[in-house]
Amino acid sequence: MKKNKYGFLIRFLMKICLWGVAFFLILTYVIGFFRATGNSMFPSIKDGDLCILYKIEESHTNDIVLYKTSDGKERLGRIVAVGEQKVNFPEEGGYTVNDYQPAEEITYETYRAEKSDMKYPITLEKDEYFILNDYRSDTSDSREYGVVKKEDIEGKLIFILRRRGF
């Protein structure tokens, strides 16, 4: 009789451990969380928003992604150009990808970063991305840090939980 009681307890603990391992693996390799700080992605993402990221899917133009900068910081940004595309910032403002102005829902004033050593036009290598903030006055994106490599992209934004207002 005692053997059955302990057998049930062992099976129960094994199930809890299995669920715990599965939950850990999902949170480590599939889904990620990031709390947005600052207004670099305003109006899309506001300061304090909780961002839910999908880590497996390939990133494409216009996706909002979490990436690591050359100095190790994690930042959110929008992909505006992908591998083997040419990006330029004309003197009069704006930017072009393959000599065309990309269509955007909201038109943002976009200029080169003043404190950057980047030379334009720049042609991206395969598995490189050019990322801009939605709040383009904040130039702490590819204009300042340079192109982002595929391995530096940590995940693609799939959902936002607003923490303040709507």
Residue ranges and their predicted role:
Residues 2-10, 14, 29-35, 43-166:
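Soluble "head" domains of membrane/secretory-pathway proteins
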Residues 13-21:
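Sec-dependent signal peptide hydrophobic core
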